[in-house]
Amino acid sequence: MSAEDLFTIQILCDQIELKLASIVINSNIKLQLKRKKKTQQL
């Protein structure tokens, strides 16, 4: 394992974390929108 390999792995891990974070944020927003629609219907 060279330093370049470790650096590449670090970048990939960061990208995966960002993708996971954006997925979580998007799903949270969708849940909030669904709740708003339900409360508006009542």
From Swiss-Prot:
One of its GO terms (cellular component) is Pi Mi complex. GO terms for biological process: cell cycle switching, mitotic to meiotic cell cycle; mating type determination; negative regulation of conjugation with zygote; positive regulation of meiotic cell cycle; positive regulation of transcription by RNA polymerase II; regulation of cell cycle switching, mitotic to meiotic cell cycle. It is found in: Cytoplasm; Nucleus. The keyword Membrane does not apply. The keyword Cytoplasm applies. Keywords: Cytoplasm, Nucleus. There are three genetic loci for mating type genes in S.pombe, mat1, mat2-P and mat3-M. Cell type is determined by the alternate allele present in mat1, either P (plus) in a h+ or M (minus) in a h- cell. Mat2-P and mat3-M serve as donor of information that is transposed to mat1 during a switch of mating type. Mating type proteins are sequence specific DNA-binding proteins that act as master switches in yeast differentiation by controlling gene expression in a cell type-specific fashion. Required for meiosis, but plays no role in conjugation. This is Mating-type M-specific polypeptide Mi. The gene is mat1-Mi.
